[in-house]
Each structure stands twice: as structure tokens, then as C-alpha cells.
């Protein structure tokens, strides 16, 4: 029995059907706006969601971690803690360096944060040590964000000190000026300097001290104003030879006289041109190098920034000698571009598959062209809105457009199928278009707004995850909205002009065969549907079981935060015993580097040893392993990491921690592994008590891998205990003691050499090669009040102690970070549960506070809001459907399709070994919007048949199911094929796209089968319930 359409006159589509020229030009305008907008859209890996972050670095060479903490970090933290909009403040105080990282609220502009930081630094200046070589320097950069570009500068003919000087003045400064660059660091520590190495025995023999030498040097090298002479006729500027420029000048410097004979600096010290810090070194593929790391500002577009650097590099390298080679070792934009290209290909493949399925069902070229035009028009038109909203072409927006391919064609399919049905019945194309479009208009509006309603909760997600998916949700919603407009305007107009009874009746052998196939399928479906309607309670039991199963799967499926991406770059930390020297650490780094470079997947390697703003201690080395492009290696990054760690396990005395770089960086500190867990206390003593037991328990957990802590309190220290009474009797102050020690062992920067292009330091130290270790303290001499020379050992004793290698703070309190990775056979959710269980078993005191950080903290936050996100999507859709249908009952019938989609998605994820992460959850939310389309198409026609033809509910829903079977199948397959390329993705960034495709394909497959039977049964059950309520509560009939 055929359901007859109501007599309508085209509704909102009538104007566009009757005015084809205006409609065509309107669509051309949308197309041109999208094409123009596409050209202005920037390209990036992900939407820009970085927290405004500023790093403040203060260098104090020779200072211990305790001194750096109390003299530099603490005063700065007190001022920074008063800034408004500050989200988190972390600091690391190591030997000679203080690094404070300030993370602000997402809503605070970075420029405003910069002004607050500068004001806080100015306020703290008076509290900082007076002998700081340089004031605190801030950079608009997140230290945990990997460099966007790494360059290695090498030379076999020129000393590395000269190479660094050229690179710093000619290359690094120019790159720093590029828009979007936050910080350019030169790893390698080869800044030119004049190094003065005192001979302790020679000084002692001459009755001098290191302080005498320091004072002589600082007094002999000055660069200050001298004034000018203003005569009656002319003015003369005064200058003098007050500066010493070379090591030879310093060798000839007279530091004292003895018996009338001059004592020159060269008599008591070796003076040479060298590096400012001899305990820093960088290597590129085992060759000594200056490694230039370029980091972007938070929020800057990585592609634009890298392109600008690439454009200026040829000009910059031309200014360097030919023997100096500049090599780009890593460029994160290479993988970003490859990932975007792969996603663009998947988008085009999805479009092709969707058009193919349309032709398969319609078996008519003109009828296929119409939705074939609607798809690209809807997608391209979206670009214009994206430009207006300052979006970018990134993996998430392209994923949204790929998924939208299956969505946007649905509306056109529903319109074409309905109009074609009237043409086949003998209606004229124009009359059929008016009648079909008018009849289906409300359905299109229902489909569109109910689907957009699902996306509304994504727009209100908080914190960084909400920012991340805002572009995804808005892009998808815009594409769907444009699709609805196209389907109600262009599609019926084209149907009126391109379709005819003859074109639809024209069939070839394939068309006839496929028609017979579909007729048989519909007949089989009709027979099964009759049986199902005869056993409604059994079908209802199946529907309820899917709901129960979806809840069970939701609870037990492994959960994660964000897929681990293979971006072709691995960040590594090499850990050695805490008392290791620079030379020993450099040799261990060389051994490990030679092993890593032998791996077939590795293309290049940079490594760094020493203490600076990113590396807290000498016993740590930083590595960056650059892999070959994905199509040139056999293994993904996680496999390569496992292989490298196994290979390095054979090197004694080192531990290697590796993690792949990610496009999404939430952390604010450089970590050894992917995830972090912190312990915070009021004192370092409390941490020293509780960190070891917790660390040992976590290392025994199978859910965790590479567990380590940054708590290092076994560094060797020489504690010099001065007899203050004896020192006072001799007229020696504690300042005299500190100065003597600093002069000998602190690589003290005692003077500055000024040139037209740069400034260079004079470094003072004691030559310890003859007397290494603690014996060098016996050579320290002090001057008493009567001018006598007093050895340090006469007034002090030396004790060996252990000391922390660094002191870390979080929001001004001591903290230690436990880093961990998750093994392949476990999920982040299971790892988090294991950590919480270990924490509870230890029963921490109240002054110990624990918290996950970075990605693991974001995972906890996202996990807590996931259920509410799904509930909000369902509630939003119920409200929209209730308003559209003016009914409390029919939206429930439509929403009854959701459990089947949830079960299908969760089963697919489980079978594929994929975690339920935020990407997969977005897929499930989209399924909520997709699968209800089946029910809407059925219920709309059933209600029309009841209302306008007087059919009983069972006959109405039965006929509606048969009548809408083909468009339901078409739209579901279109959505499925739109997601299929994502599920089968294998290229760069596939880890990000695959969970979305798996969840959607699995959910669509199962829901397509079940909802064809469960929806009509639930429709009839609710119809009976409605009648029962009307009889029992006749006064509420209208409300029901």
C-alpha cells in the first residue's frame, strides 16, 4: 500500500524552484566565497589551543641549586604569584640556572601576560643578587613544546667558538625577528670568551690571592663614559685604551709588583681564547655542533612561521664562510603537511565513495549529478565561514569535512528520492519538485537542527579540550547547515530541470538487475518486519539489552586521552649516576648516540650535555631523534622506541627515556616521558621521605613503564664549614670566603669585552688539572686584615654530603614529578587507576598533595565530563525534536536508536584494540546525530499517513518503513563510506583519524540493521502508551 503525500505547494523551496537563475547565481556566490576563503586559510596540525605561556630564565654560573632557589627563584615567584590570570607556576632551580614557567588562563591575551611578567621582574630586581651576570630574561614560549625546527651548524675548519659567534649575530637574531618565533636557543655552549685559569701554586708562591687577580682584571678592563672637551672653536670627544680585546692583552696585564718587578697575569695563569662555559656541549650525528632550536610563540601558526624561516635561510647562510655548514635536521611542518595532505586525500576519497553509492542506488546519471553538486558546494562554502571565524585547515577541521561528506549528501538524497518517486508516478518534473520538496521540507529541517543540536555540547566543553574541538564542531555544523540550504534550494530546482519520467525510466542491464535486487531486499525486509511487529516485546528486549550492553562496554573498555601520534621525532633523556662529570657524561652520550644512529629508522640525531635553561643537571643529556619519513621506514614510532631502548640497555650506567613528540602539548615542563604525576609538600624533607616508597611501588606496576622521578638528592657536595671565630680574628669575612671559592670553581664572569657587534666575557677559574677533586680546596688562599695570606684549610673544614641536583617548585611549594609511559597492552585509564591505588596504599600525611599533570590531568578532566557530554547531547537533541514535533513522546521514539549505535561503536573500538579516547567519544556523539535520521524519516511519513490518510498506526509505520527503506539505506551507507577512509587511514596522522572512523563505521553498521526493526516496534508501543494516557487523563489530551 502506497503512502500518498500531502498536497503542498513547495513550501520554502518554491521561490528557488521557480527562479532557477537567481538560485544558480546564489550557489555560484557561495562557491566563489568558499574558494577565495580557502586561499586565505592557514594550515596547521591542530586548532590553536595553546595556553598563554611565558618562560623566565635567570643564569647565575657557579651557584648551587639551594642558592639559586633562595636568591633568585623565590623572589621572582613571590612577585609572579601576585599576577592576575595566572593558572600555574612551576620552577626549576639547578646549578647555575633558574627557570620559571608561567601558564596563564586561556582567556588572557599573551601580550597582557607579557606586560604583567615584565612588571613582576622589575619589582623583584632589588631582591636579586647584585653580581648576576645578566638580569632575568623572559620568552613567550612553552618549554615543553618541541622545537618547530632544529638546525645544526658545523665546521671542520673554524673553531666552534667562532662558529657560534657568527651564528648568534648573523643567523639567530634574524630568525628571532620572524613573526611567530618565541625563542631561538643555541645549544652547545661555545660562546667566545677569554678564559683565565689560575695556577694556584704560582699565586701562593708570590703571596697573592685569586681576589687580587680578579680585582686587577676588572679594574684594567672598563668601557665607560669619558666626556668631551668643548673649546671656543671645536669639540673633542675623549677616548682611551681602557679595554683589552684579546687573550694576549690579558696575558700582558700587570696584576701586582714584587720587589719593584711587575707580575703579569701570564705569570700566574694560562690565558686563552675559549668558550664561556666549558661544561656545555652539543652534537649533531656525533659531530660537535651548534644546535639551533626554534620554538614558536603559543598560538602562532607553525606553518607560516616555518615557511618564513625557510625563505630567509639561504640569504642568512650566504653570510657565513663556506666551511660552515647549516643543516635543517628537523622540521615539524614536514609531517604536518603530510598529515594534512593525507586527510585531504581521504576527504576526496570519501566524496568519490559517496557519489558512487548514490549512483548505485539511483542508477541515473542526472539524478547522481544533483547530490554530486551539493556535496562539494556545501563543503567549499564552509571555507568562507571558517575564514570569518579565524579557523585553519588542520586535521580536525578536515576530519569534520570528511565526516560531513556523508552528512551533507543525506539531505539531497532525501529530497531527490522523494521527488523522483512522484515523477515515476507520472507527475510533471516541476509539479513533482514542488510537491516533493514541500512534503520533505520539514523532515530536512528536523534532520538538520537535531544533528546540529548534538554538536552544541561540544561548544561548551571547558578548558583545552573544549578549545580543541570547537573548530571541529563549528565546521561540521556549518557544513550541515549549508547542506540543508542547498537541499531546499538548489537540489529541487535541479530536479525540476534535469529529471524527467523518461530519464528515470531509462534503464540498462545493470539498472534492471540492481532494481530487481533492491525489490527483493525490500520484500525480504517487509516479511521480517511483519514478524517483528508480531513479537514487539521480544524486540523491545533486544533494544533494552543493547542499552545494557552499551553501559557495560562503556565501563570496561580501555580509556585514553588523545591518540599517540607518529610525527617522526622522538625526544629523549639520557640519565646517568648523579655524581657524573661532564666529560664522563659526554662519553656516555657518544656511546648511546652511536647505537641510535645504527637503527634503520633513524635519519639524524642531536644531543646536548650540560646545565642550561632546559637541562637541570650534568647527569642528564637531551636527545632529539629524527626518524625517516613514514613511507621510508617499516615501523611506527612506538616500535622504534622499544627497539632503541632495548639496544641501549646494554650500555652500563645509563637509562634512556624516550617519547614521541606530539602536536598537542599541554605540559609546561620538559619531561622524560609522556605522562606526569606530582607530589607536592611544604618541605623538601617530606618529599625525601615519601618519594622513594611511592616510586618503588609504581615501578612494580605492570600498567606503567619507564617510571622515573626528577627527585635527585644524591649529588655529591663539599660542605665547607668555616670557623667564624677564627676567621673574624684574622679579619676574614664570609664574603671573602665565598669570593675565593667562586673565583676558583664557579667559572666566574668577571669582566665584559665590548665590541661593535657583540659582547664577550672574561671567565676566571682555577686550573684543577694538577689537583683534581677536593684536594683543589687546599690551594685556596685568603688575605687577612694585616695583609697576610691564610689558607682556607686554616679556618675551615670540609665535609662530604649529598645535595639535590635541582629544586623544583609548583605554585611556590617544593614538588617532585614522577614520569611514566603506558605499555602497549594497557590504557592510560588503567595506568591512572594503578597510580591512585598505590597512592592510597601508602596513606600519605596531609601535607603531601598529589596531582596528575599535563595530558594525564587533562585525561582525568575529560573522563569526568564525558558522560555529561553524551547526556547533554541527548538532552539537546530531545529538546530540539520536542519543539519540532510538538510532542513529548516522538522524540523518545527517535532517541531509542542511540543504544544500538553506542554498542556498535564500542564493540568496533574493542575489536580494533583502540582506546575510548576523546576522538572516539566525538565519533559516538556524532553517531547520536546520524542514527536518529532513520527514525525521523520513518516517523515523519508514518505520522503523515495517519494524519492525512487515516491509516492505523501499525499500517502507517509498516508502509513508512518500506517506503523509506531505500533512502535510509542510502543515507546510512553514505555516512558510513564518508567515515570509511578515516578508519582505513594509514598515513601520517592516521592515529588521530582512525578512532573516529572505527567508532562511526561500527556504530552505523549495527544501528542500520537493528533500528530498521526496533524503531517501528517502539513507535507502536509509545502510540499505545499515548492512547492509554489519553483515556486515563482526558484533561491532558492536548498536552499529550
From Swiss-Prot:
GO terms for molecular function: xenobiotic transmembrane transporter activity. GO terms for cellular component: plasma membrane. Keywords: Cell inner membrane, Cell membrane, Membrane, Transmembrane, Transmembrane helix, Transport. Disulfide bonds: none annotated. The chain crosses the membrane at residues 16-36, 342-362, 369-389, 396-416, 440-460, 472-492, 537-557, 863-883, 888-908, 911-931, 968-988, 998-1018. The keyword Iron does not apply. Belongs to the resistance-nodulation-cell division (RND) (TC 2.A.6) family. MdtB subfamily. Part of a tripartite efflux system composed of MdtA, MdtB and MdtC. MdtB forms a heteromultimer with MdtC. PANTHER family: MULTIDRUG RESISTANCE PROTEIN MDTB, PTHR32063. HAMAP family: MdtB. This is Multidrug resistance protein MdtB. The gene is mdtB.
Amino acid at each position: 500500500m502506497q503512502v500518498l503525500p500531502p498536497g503542498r505547494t513547495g513550501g520554502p523551496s518554491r521561490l528557488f524552484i521557480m527562479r532557477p537563475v537567481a538560485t544558480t547565481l546564489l550557489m555560484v556566490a557561495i562557491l566563489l566565497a568558499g574558494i577565495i576563503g580557502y586561499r586565505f586559510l592557514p594550515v596547521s596540525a591542530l586548532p590553536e589551543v595553546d595556553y598563554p605561556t611565558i618562560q623566565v630564565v635567570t643564569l647565575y654560573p657557579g651557584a648551587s641549586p639551594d642558592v639559586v632557589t633562595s636568591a633568585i627563584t623565590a623572589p621572582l615567584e613571590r612577585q609572579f604569584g601576585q599576577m592576575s590570570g595566572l593558572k600555574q607556576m612551576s620552577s626549576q632551580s639547578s646549578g647555575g640556572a633558574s627557570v620559571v614557567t608561567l601558564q596563564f588562563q586561556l582567556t588572557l591575551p599573551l601580550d597582557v601576560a607579557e606586560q604583567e611578567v615584565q612588571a613582576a621582574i622589575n619589582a623583584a630586581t632589588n631582591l636579586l643578587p647584585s653580581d648576576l651576570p645578566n638580569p632575568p630574561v623572559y620568552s613567550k614560549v612553552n618549554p615543553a613544546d618541541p622545537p618547530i625546527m632544529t638546525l645544526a651548524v658545523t665546521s671542520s675548519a673554524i673553531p666552534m667558538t667562532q662558529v657560534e659567534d657568527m651564528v648568534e649575530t648573523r643567523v639567530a637574531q634574524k630568525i628571532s625577528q620572524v613573526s611567530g618565533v618565541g625563542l631561538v636557543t643555541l645549544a652547545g655552549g661555545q660562546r667566545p670568551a677569554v678564559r683565565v685559569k689560575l695556577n694556584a701554586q704560582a699565586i701562593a708562591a708570590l703571596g697573592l690571592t685569586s681576589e687580587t687577580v680578579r680585582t686587577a682584571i676588572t679594574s684594567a678592563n672598563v668601557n665607560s663614559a669619558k666626556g668631551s672637551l668643548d673649546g671656543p672653536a671645536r669639540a673633542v670627544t675623549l677616548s682611551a685604551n681602557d679595554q683589552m680585546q684579546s687573550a694576549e692583552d690579558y696575558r700582558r696585564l700587570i696584576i701586582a709588583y714584587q720587589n719593584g718587578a711587575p707580575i703579569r697575569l701570564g705569570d700566574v695563569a694560562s690565558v686563552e681564547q675559549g668558550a664561556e662555559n666549558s661544561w656545555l656541549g652539543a652534537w649533531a650525528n656525533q659531530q660537535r655542533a651548534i644546535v639551533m632550536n626554534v620554538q614558536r610563540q603559543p598560538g602562532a601558526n607553525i606553518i607560516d612561521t616555518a615557511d618564513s624561516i625557510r625563505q630567509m635561510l639561504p640569504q642568512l647562510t650566504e653570510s657565513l664562510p663556506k666551511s660552515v655548514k647549516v643543516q635543517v635536521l628537523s622540521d615539524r611542518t614536514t609531517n604536518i603537511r603530510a598529515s594534512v595532505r593525507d586527510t585531504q586525500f581521504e576527504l576526496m576519497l570519501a566524496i568519490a565513495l559517496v557519489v558512487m553509492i548514490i549512483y548505485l542506488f539511483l542508477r541515473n546519471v542526472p539524478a547522481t549529478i544533483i547530490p554530486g553538486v551539493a556535496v562539494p558546494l556545501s563543503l567549499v562554502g564552509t571555507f568562507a565561514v571558517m575564514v570569518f571565524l579565524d579557523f585553519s585547515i588542520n586535521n580536525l577541521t578536515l576530519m569534520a569535512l570528511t565526516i560531513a561528506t556523508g552528512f551533507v549528501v543525506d539531505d539531497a538524497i532525501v529530497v531527490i528520492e522523494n521527488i523522483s518517486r512522484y515523477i515515476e508516478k507520472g507527475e510533471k518534473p516541476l509539479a513533482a519538485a514542488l510537491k516533493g520538496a514541500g512534503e520533505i521540507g520539514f523532515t530536512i529541517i528536523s534532520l538538520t537542527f537535531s544533528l546540529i543540536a548534538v554538536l552544541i555540547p561540544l561548544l561548551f566543553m571547558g578548558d583545552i579540550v573544549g578549545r580543541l574541538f570547537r573548530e571541529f564542531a563549528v565546521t561540521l555544523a556549518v557544513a550541515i547547515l549549508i547542506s540543508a540550504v542547498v537541499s531546499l534550494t538548489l537540489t529541487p530546482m535541479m530536479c525540476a530541470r534535469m529529471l524527467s519520467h523518461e530519464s528515470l525510466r531509462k534503464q540498462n542491464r545493470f539498472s534492471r538487475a540492481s532494481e530487481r535486487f533492491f525489490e527483493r531486499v525490500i520484500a525480504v525486509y517487509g516479511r521480517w518486519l511483519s514478524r517483528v511487529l508480531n513479537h514487539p516485546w521480544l524486540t523491545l528486549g533486544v533494544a533494552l539489552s543493547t542499552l545494557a550492553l552499551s553501559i557495560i562496554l562503556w565501563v570496561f573498555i580501555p580509556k585514553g586521552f588523545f591518540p599517540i601520534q607518529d610525527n617522526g621525532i622522538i625526544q629523549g633523556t639520557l640519565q646517568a649516576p648523579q655524581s657524573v662529570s661532564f666529560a664522563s657524561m659526554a662519553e656516555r652520550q657518544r656511546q648511546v648516540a652511536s647505537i641510535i644512529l645504527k637503527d634503520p629508522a633513524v635519519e639524524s640525531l642531536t644531543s646536548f650535555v650540560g646545565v642550561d635553561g632546559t637541562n637541570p643537571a650534568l647527569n642528564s643529556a637531551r636527545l632529539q631523534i629524527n626518524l625517516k619519513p613514514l613511507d621510508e621506514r617499516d615501523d611506527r614510532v612506538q616500535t622504534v622506541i622499544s627497539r632503541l631502548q632495548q639496544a641501549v640497555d646494554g650500555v652500563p650506567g645509563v637509562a634512556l627515556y624516550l617519547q614521541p613528540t606530539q602536536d598537542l602539548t599541554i605540559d609546561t615542563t620538559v619531561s622524560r616521558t609522556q605522562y606526569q604525576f606530582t607530589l607536592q609538600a611544604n618541605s623538601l624533607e617530606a618529599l625525601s621521605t615519601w618519594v622513594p616508597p611511592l616510586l618503588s611501588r609504581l615501578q612494580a606496576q605492570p600498567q606503567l613503564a619507564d617510571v622515573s622521578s626528577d627527585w635527585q638528592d644524591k649529588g655529591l657536595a663539599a660542605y665547607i664549614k668555616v670557623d667564624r671565630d677564627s676567621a673574624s680574628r684574622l679579619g676574614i669575612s664570609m664574603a671573602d670566603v665565598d669570593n675565593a671559592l667562586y673565583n676558583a670553581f664557579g667559572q666566574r664572569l668577571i669582566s665584559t669585552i665590548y665590541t661593535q657587534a657583540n659582547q664577550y666575557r672574561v671567565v676566571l677559574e682555577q686550573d684543577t688539572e694538577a689537583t683534581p677533586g677536593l684536594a683543589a680546596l687546599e690551594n685556596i688562599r685568603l688575605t687577612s686584615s694585616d695583609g697576610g695570606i691564610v689558607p682556607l684549610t686554616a679556618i675551615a673544614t670540609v665535609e662530604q654530603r649529598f645535595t639535590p641536583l635541582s629544586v623544583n617548585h609548583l605554585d611556590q611549594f617544593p614538588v617532585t614529578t614522577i614520569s611514566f609511559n603506558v605499555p602497549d597492552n594497557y590504557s592510560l585509564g588503567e595506568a591512572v587507576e594503578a597510580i591512585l591505588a598505590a597512592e592510597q596504599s601508602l596513606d600519605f600525611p596531609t601535607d603531601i598533595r598529589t596531582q596528575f599533570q599535563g595530558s594525564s590531568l587533562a585525561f582525568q578532566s575529560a573522563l569526568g565530563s564525558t558522560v555529561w557530554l553524551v547526556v547533554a547531547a541527548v538532552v539537546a537533541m530531545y529538546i530540539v525534536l520536542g519543539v519540532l514535533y510538538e510532542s513529548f513522546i516522538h522524540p523518545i521514539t527517535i532517541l531509542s536508536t542511540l543504544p544500538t549505535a553506542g554498542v556498535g561503536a564500542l564493540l568496533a573500538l574493542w575489536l580494533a584494540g583502540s582506546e575510548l579516547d576523546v576522538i572516539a567519544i566525538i565519533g559516538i556523539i556524532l553517531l547520536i546525530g546520524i542514527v536518529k535520521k532513520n527514525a525521523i524519516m520513518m516517523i515523519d511519513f508514518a505520522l503523515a499517513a495517519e494524519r492525512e490518510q487515516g491509516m492505523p498506526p501499525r499500517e502507517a509505520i509498516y508502509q513508512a518503513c518500506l517506503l523509506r527503506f531505500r533512502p535510509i539505506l542510502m543515507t546510512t551507507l553514505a555516512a558510513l563510506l564518508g567515515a570509511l577512509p578515516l578508519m582505513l587511514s594509514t598515513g601520517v596522522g592516521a592515529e588521530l583519524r582512525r578512532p573516529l572512523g572505527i567508532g562511526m563505521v561500527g556504530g552505523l553498521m549495527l544501528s542500520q540493521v537493528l533500528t530498521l526493526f526496533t524503531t517501528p516496534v517502539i513507535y507502536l508501543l509509545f502510540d499505545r502508551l499515548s492512547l492509554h494516557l489519553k483515556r486515563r487523563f482526558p484533561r491532558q489530551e492536548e498536552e499529550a
